[in-house]
């Protein structure tokens, strides 16, 4: 075995950095300085361990080619091997005499005996696996085995290569010959299978079913013989060595240094490639830190690189998360003081671990039957009992396998969630005894603010419940009022007016106090919408009841936007209809746009159940065989009945409505309904009515799409206008006669109300995605890199503009809220999650006002649509001006009404 020799990274320059140590020591003392730099050092060491663990796991699984260390090498070698395979095919095609055993399988994807019997004309139609795919397959298989001592023998590698190519030829024909069927019925299910064995077993069942229906020409696969597989694999190894020099054949050495002629040849990476991969793996391991919270205030941001953490490190933080250093440099000279101030205020907020909640978390996450549904179980759910006649009863076997598959699918997600859960709990325990911790923040390229460490206040309910702000104030009467509102919100009682929320808390005071007194036995709190955040509320509520209104409370209370994307579109367009649906207007009741859409959907469902179309059953003839198979298209009446039986609530429509403002299309809504509602319902036994899941999802997607687009007409108009602008800017303008380029494709640029510049610049990759049936996918070079920027991707520019534009606006609003709340109301503790602003109860009333005041100021002082137009209009060619739709008209929404709306941010 020719293993990688990955040197140990020395991160001592982080822990021993003199300048940051002196600064920290002067301000926070020697111990804090040492601990902070030790944490930053540990972040790199933990990152290194994580990288190497992933590398080891991929090596053991034979997936080394998918590791970041190997991907550039695959990209480099792929065109070289592709050319060598093409050359060999041409050489053999032109050679006289009998073809080698490997020729027909490699050239045409069929066994030699079958190829000879086919005849030349028929054989021409058998294109086989492409040289590009064969090259990728060969590199992935060989790299996957070169590090595994029991798999690196030449015969073993050759055999695996031959089998892999046969599988690609055999099952790849399904994708090629029956593309529509594969995409609709096979692709997603194949991706859900983990491991080659399960994927192949699934595809064998698919193949048999298709052949029984007269598809694939009705022909069974003519298997390659074992020796033929060996010939194919050996030839591919030879071509790999000739074309790339990636591997070499070696034998074990005798004591005198000579080859052991009795041993089998080994396939080993050539020394030059071992060194190359080792260096790259070592470098990557050294720049993959697992960032953690700080035990001193983070380093303030004063420029675009180097804030947050105090040591420089191998990979200093950037203020803006961009795809390249070149993109980051654009921000270097930008004057945006409010942006810097907002991010610094966010990360200068001290937090601490909520020890009371953590004590409960430490116990409850290890219960076999945890009452909190979102806590991933310790063990896999038990498989359904196997039928006694499973070996002889085909119907019973299929039913059992379907139920078992659902268990395995859920368990895959459980394992991933469990790992994240255990990491978060470990981090909370690690920092539990610190009086204060801080979280460095930066932004994505649209200006949305993110915490950097994996453990942070923007996490799930358990993580948020396990953290609280470090600086509190006496809660007072007003703060106690907002604490009650927060408690009701955490319980899911957030779609009713404030008095009803207060009433819910007061009526359940006994349950709240009992939960606080003994949460492990009094588990009423686990039934609430956000159980851990609600438990944190219970402890604080009990504290106020015990100590009175002078109780020092630091629990963060959040004011969330009501479908913020549509709120921003409605405000910028003064749309009173959409604005009312998302609570921008004063009202005695809470407007729930998700329920509004659900109600409209239910109206149509009841109509369709009575007057809808009927199911159609067609006999479809196979184009090649002429055989018929049945196609069932469920009618509206049947689909409506299924959904009425299941029940369409706001939960079904929420994600689809929420993402409309972020550019989702009907096809995405269909996928969301399938993933969020139908598949989970089928898995837990509540979705048995969905006999045709894809049809049910498509039907519901159309109903939701139709309902939401008539509810927020102005938002849809704005999104379409933005797409038109992006499409024109991304278009290349040529002279019709001379074909001279009059205007190149342009990226899009705009500036948010608080001065943050946004560049949307999606470019086409000089690569293509090559996907194998079983061995995954990879980017492969289509052209050699010239060092110049690639062409603007017009499709991505158009589809991305609506979500990116509105995300930039809510990011700006959040930052402006932070600065305004600090400057006007003196608030200095912030809990921020995109469209949610929070602070301690004593300051909550002022933040309630601040978030509304900045929303009004944003759109009173800025016509963001007109400003956007002004920033790109000069870039349009004169021939495009008449193609640009007029700027959307404004409605009659009075922005000042937002100040009086209780529920706009609540």
From Swiss-Prot:
**What Pfam families does this protein map onto?**
RNA_pol (PF00940), RPOL_N (PF14700)
| Keywords for the protein's UniProt record, in alphabetical order | DNA-directed RNA polymerase, Nucleotidyltransferase, Transcription, Transferase, Viral transcription
**Which E.C. number(s) belong to this protein?**
2.7.7.6
| GO BP terms | DNA-templated transcription; viral transcription
Q: Which GO terms describe its cellular component?
A: DNA-directed RNA polymerase complex
* Catalysed transformations (reactions): RNA(n) + a ribonucleoside 5'-triphosphate = RNA(n+1) + diphosphate
Q: Which GO terms describe its molecular function?
A: DNA binding; DNA-directed RNA polymerase activity
| Keyword RNA-binding applies | no
Catalytic residues per the record?
Answer: 560, 654, 835
Report the sequence similarity comment from the record: Belongs to the phage and mitochondrial RNA polymerase family.
Q: Give the protein's biological function.
A: DNA-dependent RNA polymerase catalyzes the transcription of DNA into RNA using the four ribonucleoside triphosphates as substrates.
* Protein name per UniProt: DNA-directed RNA polymerase
What broad taxonomic lineage does this protein's source fall under? Viruses, Duplodnaviria, Heunggongvirae, Uroviricota, Caudoviricetes
GN (gene name): 1
């Amino acid at each position: 075995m020719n293993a990688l020799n990955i040197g140990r990274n020395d991160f001592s320059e982080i822990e021993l950095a003199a300048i940051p140590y002196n600064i920290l020591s002067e301000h926070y003392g020697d111990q804090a300085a040492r601990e902070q730099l030790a944490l930053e050092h540990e972040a790199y060491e933990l990152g290194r361990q994580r990288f190497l663990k992933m590398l080891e796991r991929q090596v053991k699984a034979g997936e080394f080619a998918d590791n970041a260390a190997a991907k550039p090498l695959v990209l480099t070698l792929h065109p070289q091997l592709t050319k060598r395979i093409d050359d060999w095919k041409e050489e053999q095609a032109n050679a006289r005499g009998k073809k080698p055993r490997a020729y027909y399988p490699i050239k045409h994807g069929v066994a030699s005996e079958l190829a000879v019997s086919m005849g030349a004309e028929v054989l021409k139609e058998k294109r086989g696996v492409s040289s590009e795919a064969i090259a990728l397959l060969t590199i992935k298989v060989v790299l996957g085995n070169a590090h595994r001592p029991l798999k690196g023998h030449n015969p073993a590698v050759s055999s695996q290569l031959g089998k892999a190519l046969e599988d690609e030829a055999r099952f790849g024909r399904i994708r090629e010959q029956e593309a529509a069927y594969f995409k609709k019925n096979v692709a997603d299910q194949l991706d859900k299978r983990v491991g080659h064995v399960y994927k192949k077993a699934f595809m064998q069942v698919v193949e048999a079913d298709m052949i029984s229906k007269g598809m694939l020409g009705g022909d069974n696969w003519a298997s390659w013989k074992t020796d033929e597989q060996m010939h194919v694999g050996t030839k591919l190894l030879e071509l790999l060595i000739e074309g790339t020099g990636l591997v070499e054949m070696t034998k074990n050495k005798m004591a005198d240094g000579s080859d052991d002629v009795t041993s089998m040849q080994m396939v080993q990476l050539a020394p030059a490639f071992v060194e190359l991969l080792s260096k790259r793996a070592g470098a990557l391991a050294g720049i993959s830190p697992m960032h953690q919270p700080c035990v001193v205030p983070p380093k303030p941001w004063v420029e675009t690189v180097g804030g947050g953490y105090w040591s420089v490190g191998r990979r200093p933080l950037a203020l803006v998360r961009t795809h390249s250093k070149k993109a980051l440099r654009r921000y270097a000279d930008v004057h945006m003081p409010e942006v810097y101030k907002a991010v610094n205020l966010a990360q200068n907020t001290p937090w601490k671990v909520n020890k009371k909640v953590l004590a409960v978390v430490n116990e409850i996450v290890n219960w076999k039957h945890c009452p909190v549904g979102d806590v991933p179980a310790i063990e896999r759910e038990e498989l359904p009992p196997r039928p006694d006649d499973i070996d002889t009863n085909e119907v019973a076997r299929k039913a059992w396998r379907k139920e078992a598959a659902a268990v395995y699918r859920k368990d895959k997600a459980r394992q991933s969630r469990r790992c994240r859960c255990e990491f978060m709990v470990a981090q909370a325990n690690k920092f539990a005894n610190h009086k204060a911790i801080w979280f460095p923040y930066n932004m994505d390229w649209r200006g949305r603010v993110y915490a950097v460490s994996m453990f942070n206040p923007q996490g799930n309910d358990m993580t948020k419940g396990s953290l609280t702000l470090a600086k509190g104030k006496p809660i007072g009467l007003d703060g106690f009022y907002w604490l009650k509102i927060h408690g009701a919100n955490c319980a899911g009682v957030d779609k009713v007016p404030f008095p009803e929320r207060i009433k819910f808390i007061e009526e359940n005071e006994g349950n709240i106090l009992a939960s606080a007194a003994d949460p492990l036995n009094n588990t009423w709190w686990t039934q609430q919408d956000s159980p851990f955040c609600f438990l944190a509320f219970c402890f604080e509520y009990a504290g106020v009841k015990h100590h009175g209104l002078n109780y020092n409370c630091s629990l963060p209370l959040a004011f969330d936007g009501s479908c913020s994307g549509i709120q921003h579109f409605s405000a910028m367009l003064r749309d009173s209809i959409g604005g009312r649906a998302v609570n921008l207007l004063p009202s005695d009741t809470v407007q729930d746009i998700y329920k509004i859409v659900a109600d409209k959907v239910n109206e149509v469902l009841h109509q369709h159940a009575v007057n809808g179309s009927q199911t159609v059953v067609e006999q479809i003839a196979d184009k090649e065989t002429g055989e018929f198979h049945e196609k069932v298209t469920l009618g509206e009446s049947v689909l409506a009945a299924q959904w009425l039986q299941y029940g369409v609530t706001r939960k079904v429509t929420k994600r689809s409505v929420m993402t409309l403002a972020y550019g989702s299309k009907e096809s995405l809504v269909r996928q969301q309904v399938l993933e969020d509602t139908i598949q989970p319902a089928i898995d837990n036994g509540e979705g048995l009515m969905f006999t045709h899941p894809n049809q049910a999802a498509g039907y519901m997607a159309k109903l939701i799409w139709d309902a939401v687009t008539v509810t927020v007409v102005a938002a849809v108009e704005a999104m379409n206008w933005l797409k038109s602008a992006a499409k024109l800017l991304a278009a290349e303008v040529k002279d019709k006669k001379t074909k001279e380029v009059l205007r190149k494709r342009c990226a899009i640029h705009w500036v948010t109300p608080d001065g943050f510049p946004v560049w949307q610049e999606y470019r086409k990759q000089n690569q293509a995605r090559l996907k194998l049936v079983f061995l995954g996918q990879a980017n492969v070079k289509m052209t050699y890199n010239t060092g110049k920027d690639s062409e603007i991707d017009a499709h991505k520019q158009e589809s991305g503009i609506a979500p990116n534009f509105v995300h930039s606006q809510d990011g700006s609003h959040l930052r402006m809220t932070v600065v305004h709340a600090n400057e006007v109301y003196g608030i200095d503790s912030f809990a921020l999650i995109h469209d949610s602003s929070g602070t301690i109860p004593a300051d909550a009333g002022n933040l309630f006002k601040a978030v509304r005041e900045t929303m009004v100021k944003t759109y009173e002082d800025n016509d963001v649509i007109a400003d956007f137009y002004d920033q790109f209009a000069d870039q349009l060619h004169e021939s495009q001006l008449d193609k640009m739709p007029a700027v959307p008209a404004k409605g009659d929404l009075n922005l000042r009404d937002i100040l009086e709306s209780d529920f706009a941010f609540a």
